[in-house]
Structure formats: C-alpha cells, structure tokens
C-alpha cells in the first residue's frame, strides 16, 4: 500500500487536473494510472499544450491552498515550461514537491487533430493508443525501469495498441538490454520503493521480461493469423447457367 504522503499527492494531482482547462492534454504515467488502470504509483504531472500559452499556473490560482504553495520555475522556453510546487509535503528523505512539465512540441499535431484525445470526467487526456505510442518510444529511447514495467502493463491490457513492428522493436530492446538484467533492476526498484506498486508482490514481477516476450510472441502470431485471413483470396461461387452448365 502507499504511504499517507503518497495518497495526499495523488489527491492533490486529481484536484489540479480539474483546474488546468482544455488547453492542456494530460499524458504520461500518471495519466495511465488515473484513467487507464496502471497499478504503479506515479508522482508527477505531464501535459502537452495546444496553444502557445503554456502558463498553467494562472489556472491553479483558484485552488484553495494556492496561497500556501511555493512555486519554483525549473525551465521556461518556447517549447517547455517546467516547475515544482512545494505544498508542504514531507517524506523520510525531506521535502516532496510536485513536478509539473508542460511541452509545446506537439501543438501543431494537436491542432491538426493528428493526436487523439478525449475529455474524461472533465479532463483532456490522450487516448490510450497515443499514450501507448509515447510510452513505447520512451522505452526504446531511454533506460528507465518504470517504462519497462509500463510496457508490460500495456501489452497485457491494451494489446490492440501495438502492431507487428512495435512488437519486434520492444523484443529487440529487451534482448539488447538483457532480460535478466531488466528483471533484476525491476525487483531492486520495487524492493527499495523507487517503483511503488499497489500490491508489492515480488513473485508477480519475477521473470517479468520473459513474460513480456511470451506475450509478444502470442500477439505477433495472432497478428499474423489476422493478416492471413484478411488477405485470403475469396473464391467465386460457381453457379448453374440456364443450360445446366457451370457458369464462370
């Protein structure tokens, strides 16, 4: 189970989500947790902005505790706005500020409706296909164990989000990184609470890489079968003509 400070963080993030408005599209691990059933703890908020205006802080001023927050800007540029909110949370290691990251890199794709999102309970959230695509790209391009865990979750719960090339790329990354090494890193992060699961059952994540590869193999075969059925030539039915012969 999560600690009290983590539960408070989850509640605060939900409150903030209902203040940000329609210009910001929710994405990332926390979006997966809140709206698509991910069972691990995620502590940050990530958004894509539709317009050039990436100032989300104005939207947060209506929060009942805003006057008690300390806000620290980490980065402001044409394509990024990163800041933290110190709302008084503490962990055994010290202060526990909330990180918020807004990106403007996808605004043209969003305006052209090339990235699908929906409004769920008043919050604009990327569709699962888009989040899965982003998570796949993250897993392939960086070495964070949470991406490894999330890919396994997505393959299990949302297999429709992956085509054959996606499956090949993920399998290649696991083989390149080493299945045993990935398993050890995942178990270590769970044991040291760097990666928090709702049910901390080490047995469930043992051989996690092998489970992913087995699932990939099954999904790949299913896609192959579907492709064969789709492209199977249709036989024209013979019919009898007026003279009793076989028509063409």
What are these model-derived regions, one by one?
Residues 46:
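Acidic Asp/Glu-based divalent-cation binding sites
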Residues 26-31:
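Glycine-rich beta-strand-to-loop/alpha-helix junction loops that act as flexible
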Residues 1-24, 37-40, 49-52, 56-248:
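Structured mid-to-C-terminal alpha-helical surface segments
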Residues 43:
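Periplasmic plug
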């Amino acid at each position: 189970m999560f600690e009290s400070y983590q539960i408070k963080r989850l509640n605060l993030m939900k409150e903030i989500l209902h203040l940000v408005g329609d210009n910001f599209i929710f994405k990332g691990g926390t979006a997966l947790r809140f709206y698509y059933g991910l069972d691990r703890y995620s502590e940050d908020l990530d958004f894509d902005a539709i317009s050039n205006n990436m100032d989300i802080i104005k939207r947060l001023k209506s929060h009942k505790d805003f006057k008690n927050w300390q806000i620290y800007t980490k980065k402001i540029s044409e394509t990024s706005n990163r800041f933290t909110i110190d709302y008084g949370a503490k962990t055994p290691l010290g202060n526990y500020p909330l990180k918020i990251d807004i990106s403007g890199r996808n605004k043209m794709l969003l305006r052209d409706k090339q990235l699908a999102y929906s409004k769920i309970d008043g919050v604009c959230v990327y569709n699962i296909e888009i989040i899965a695509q982003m998570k796949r790209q993250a897993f392939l391009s960086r070495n964070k164990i949470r991406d490894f865990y999330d890919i396994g979750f997505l393959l299990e719960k949302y297999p429709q989000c992956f085509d054959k090339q996606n499956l090949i790329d993920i399998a290649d990354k696991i083989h390149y990184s080493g299945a045993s090494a990935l398993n050890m890193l995942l178990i270590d992060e769970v044991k040291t609470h760097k990666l928090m699961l709702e049910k901390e059952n080490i047995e469930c994540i043992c051989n996690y890489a092998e489970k992913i590869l087995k699932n990939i193999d099954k999904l790949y075969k299913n896609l192959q079968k579907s492709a064969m059925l789709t492209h199977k030539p249709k036989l024209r039915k013979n019919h009898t003509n007026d003279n009793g012969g076989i028509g063409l």
